[in-house]
Amino acid sequence: MSYLRMLGTTLVLAGSAQLTPPAHAAPQPIVVPIMQKDLVDIPGKEMLMISVEYPPGTVESVHRHDAYAFLYVLEGTIVEAVRGGKEVTLTPGQTFYEGPNDVHTIGRNASTTKPAKFVVVLVKKKGVDAVLPAE
């Protein structure tokens, strides 16, 4: 992935929570790309690994990923849900999955005093942004 493409993806990911910010905007996620790899055995697909930090009080806006997303919590406590699914609270060592048709309705730090950190591995279409507005 070119530097500009990775930078663009990072900016899109970091701005996902700003799609419809509230009047008193909560802190935004800090997203850092770790690696990208074309999946040569799966034509048209690539893997993108990112680290995400939710500062205390972070609340993401509703969005979706045209990807298979595998989340692994490293630190803190987060709350996640997709449309039609149950809200789950995750702590270090726990995982969460989002499919390409899921709408990510809840993504937030459960704490207003401590950060939360997690890694996400996305298997996605090449050339498609990792975060998209909910439809």
Predicted features by range, described:
Residues 2-48, 81, 97, 115, ...:
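A short, N-terminal "cap"/entry segment at the start of jelly-roll beta-barrel domains
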Residues 102-128:
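Ligand-binding loop in jelly-roll beta-barrel domains
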Residues 87, 102-107, 132-135:
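N-terminal leader/targeting pre-sequences
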Residues 54, 84-101:
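Short acidic-glycine-tyrosine-enriched beta hairpin
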